[in-house]
Amino acid sequence: MKLLTKEQTRSLGLKVVPIIGSLIIRLLSLTNRKKFHAPESLGEDNFIMACWHGQLFMIPYAYTHFRKDPKVKLLISEHFDGDLIARTLSFFGFSTIRGSSTRGGVKALLQGIKDIKAGYDLGITPDGPKGPRHEVHDGIIVMAQKAKVNIVLVEIKPSKYWQVNSWDKFVIPKPFGVIEYFISEPIDVSTMGMDDAKKLIKEGMLKHEF
């Protein structure tokens, strides 16, 4: 029996994993009770949504709590795991911008600003794609200030979960529990210095750390 090459394995994975992943996300949403701690509305203005890399699994349901018709792009790395995430989220109506702090960063930054000005919301993992965990990189602040939009912080806290032994301690909810979504009021960082803005975002995203 001929074994698959690395390229063939990846190609197969890109076709199969996103389908299975999207089904699992929907199943876990259906089998968990959802509690939202959030403003009544985020208004009509578009925004940047920030979520830690390790809490990304259930992000579609945080966003669609406010936006029933998704018009959002997520900044996703150009690595293979970024391919898997991008294809999985496409099943929820999410588009992506490919790039990170290490690969395609400037291109992604400029594209993100352009898309925000065109009316898209933008999703960013401030500590992605490779950490350090819970450290806010400059990109989210630069984008918010250049595009003149506010930042909305999202924390996702399941009552029962599996945790992957990875740099981001990636969290996957277990079924038959409660998933709490903590969503902040829009935060204006337009007049703040870089260090102060990053500190504000980090502290806001660690209020319900578990």
Regions found by a protein language model. Give the residues of each.
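Catalytic core of membrane glycerolipid acyltransferases/transacylases, capturing the structured
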Residues: D45-R103, A147, Q163
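General small-molecule cofactor/ligand-binding pocket signal
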Residues: K35, I97, F182
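Non-catalytic C-terminal accessory region of glycerolipid acyltransferases
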Residues: M1-L23, L27, F91, V106-F210
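A short beta-turn/loop motif at secondary-structure boundaries
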Residues: E40-L42, G104, K174
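Pocket-edge structural micro-motifs
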Residues: F36-A38, C51-H53, I76, E185, ...
